Amino acid sequence: MAEAIGNGTGTDKKVMVAIDESDCSHYALMWVLENLKDTITKSPLIIFVAQPPATGNITFAASLGVARMYYPISSTPGYVESAQENHRKFAVALLEKAKQICASHGVEAKVVTEIGDPKTAVCDAVEKHDINLLILGERGHGTIKRAILGSVSNYCVQNAKCPVLVVKKAPVQVA
């Protein structure tokens, strides 16, 4: 499997999983740890979290989930700095949790976070870190919601400079 990934040579294949607070991101990370273990034991798995630019909400980590607080948009530099610091803390907490999960599976992980719109931040990180395979979870938005809001996975499939694997969580079967 390792030789099939990207255009790297030998053991320098770089795999990156882009995550957020969603269940589908957690599922994608677990899928990688269970299905690509041979590939990701040769070089560290890169885990990426995009920090949204400071806007009208503050996000902070709550275990594996997230809690969001909304506040009026203000041009006060203090608000912007506070919001960005909270986004950074959230990203670091999420990355540390993901790194612990990787360690519990015997996989070395390198964590990366950047500020920016998740769509472009992920693609920029792919280029910056010379990634050979990008893995994302699929959130499962419907056609209309995806058309209105856009889709990080769709954007990355079209714009990332490496192969992209979108991991779709299997639907729960009701007995």
Per-segment meaning from a language model:
Residues I40-P44, V167-Q173:
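Gly/Pro- and small hydrophobic-enriched strand-loop and loop-to-helix capping segments
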Residues K14, L133-Q158, Q173-A175:
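Glycine-rich, Arg-bearing micro-motifs that act as flexible, cationic patches
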Residues M1-T11, E34, S74, V80-E85, ...:
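Structural beta-alpha unit
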Residues N159-K168:
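Short, acidic/small-residue loops that bind anionic groups at enzyme active sites
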Residues S63-G65, K128-D130, S153:
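Short, hinge-like loop/turn segments at secondary-structure boundaries
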Residues A2-G78, Q100-H105, K110, N159:
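Small/aliphatic-rich secondary-structure junction motif
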Residues S25-H26, A54-N57, A62, T120-A121, ...:
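Eukaryotic short linear interaction motifs
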Residues A50, R139, K169-A170:
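Short, ordered loop/turn segments at secondary-structure junctions
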